[in-house]
């Protein structure tokens, strides 16, 4: 009887195992994709007042809207350089919107357009998307455009996030004969030189980032047949001087500043002057010792958190764990690494 019982149990186990393999096999062959993988956000267009505005709207309509303004001489698709944290951004519920500037990418060059023209383009796009209030995220040469927008519609701006940029570009020291010297004029025909990062930049930890930056530079200066025409870039540098000091006294919301102390384009005095030009804003500064002109990417995780929560909380990695701490919770005797733990080769 006992041997018969074992035989029945063995047979049952064999049948169950074969049934499991059958199900597994069926599952393998039934997992066909229900949609295509994304190759990045689609560039859309809006015809308005005899001109075409090119823009990207990346996120759900229910997400928190953020107008992203890329650096000097970038196209609407510079937004792709933020996609290495796209999944995290989606988890936070942030909707990124980018509007292309005059003469770059797909947008024809018009020498009569100025910074106010771009600000109106941004307003037209957010109105078209039925967005009332939104945050601004400006990096490097995009910072003055963010200030211009805030000066025109301060009541619609929930927060401003300025990374690797200056409170004022158009100073007397920088403006010579009405424009800033174009140090890029001889290299824009070489996208790999224009948008190349130094070998020690942390962005090289991100697969494909540098190549995406090369593609962005090529798109900016060749996409619409520009053939590396220097005029749009010269014009943009002139606009900084034409604007000079942008009056942002009417903005009273939160302003977050992100800067590296080793950034060759930003000095200590520049970092100190934000209060002067945003006298009524609630200013929070994130200063990163020894870091350069790539904090907008290295600390994108912190920027996204600030846009979402608008608090003074710091994202740190300690002992392999991601922690979000209030500034007064930081124990300065402990070893923290700012940002997500994924940035680290080893836990601290």
Range-by-range predicted roles:
Residues 251, 257-259:
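Short beta-strand/loop motif that positions the catalytic acidic residue
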Residues 160-189:
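Flexible "cap/lid" loop of the alpha/beta hydrolase fold
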Residues 264-270:
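Conserved alpha/beta-hydrolase "acid-adjacent" motif
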Residues 281-347:
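Catalytic active-site module of serine/aspartate enzymes centered on a nucleophile-bearing elbow/loop
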Residues 180-182, 186-246, 336-343:
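Alpha/beta-hydrolase
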Residues 72-85:
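The serine-hydrolase catalytic nucleophile loop
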Residues 117-134:
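Conserved acidic catalytic loop of the alpha/beta-hydrolase fold
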Residues 89-106:
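Conserved alpha/beta-hydrolase
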């Amino acid at each position: 009887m006992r041997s018969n019982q074992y035989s029945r149990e063995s047979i049952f186990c064999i049948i169950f195992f074969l049934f499991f393999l059958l199900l597994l096999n069926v599952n393998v062959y039934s997992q066909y994709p229900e949609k295509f993988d994304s190759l990045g956000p689609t560039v859309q267009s809006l015809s308005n007042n005899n001109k075409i505005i090119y823009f990207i709207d990346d996120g759900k309509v229910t997400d928190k809207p953020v107008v992203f303004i890329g650096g000097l001489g970038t196209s609407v698709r510079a937004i792709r350089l933020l996609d290495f944290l796209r999944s995290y951004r989606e988890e936070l519920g942030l909707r990124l919107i980018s509007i292309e500037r005059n003469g770059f990418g797909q947008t024809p060059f018009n020498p009569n357009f100025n910074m106010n023209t771009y600000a109106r383009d941004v307003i037209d796009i957010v109105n078209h998307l039925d967005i009332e209030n939104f945050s601004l995220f400006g990096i490097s040469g995009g910072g003055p455009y963010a200030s211009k927008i805030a000066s025109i519609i301060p009541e619609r701006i929930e927060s401003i996030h300025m990374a690797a940029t200056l409170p004022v570009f158009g100073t007397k020291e920088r403006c010579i004969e009405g424009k800033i010297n174009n140090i890029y004029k001889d290299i824009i025909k070489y996208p790999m030189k224009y948008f190349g990062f130094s070998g020690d930049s942390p962005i090289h930890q991100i697969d494909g980032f540098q190549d995406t930056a090369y593609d962005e530079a090529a798109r900016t200066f060749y996409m619409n047949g520009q053939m590396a025409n220097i005029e749009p870039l010269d014009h943009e540098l002139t606009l900084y001087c034409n604007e000079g000091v942008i009056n942002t006294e009417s903005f009273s919301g939160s302003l977050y500043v992100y800067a590296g102390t080793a950034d060759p384009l930003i000095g200590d005095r520049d970092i100190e002057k934000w209060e002067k030009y945003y006298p009524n804003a609630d200013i929070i500064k994130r200063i990163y010792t020894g870091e350069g002109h790539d904090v907008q990417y290295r600390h994108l995780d912190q920027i996204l958190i600030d846009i979402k929560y608008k608090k003074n909380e710091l994202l740190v990695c300690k002992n392999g764990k991601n922690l979000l701490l209030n500034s007064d919770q930081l124990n300065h005797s402990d070893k923290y690494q700012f940002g997500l733990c994924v940035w680290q080769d080893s836990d601290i």
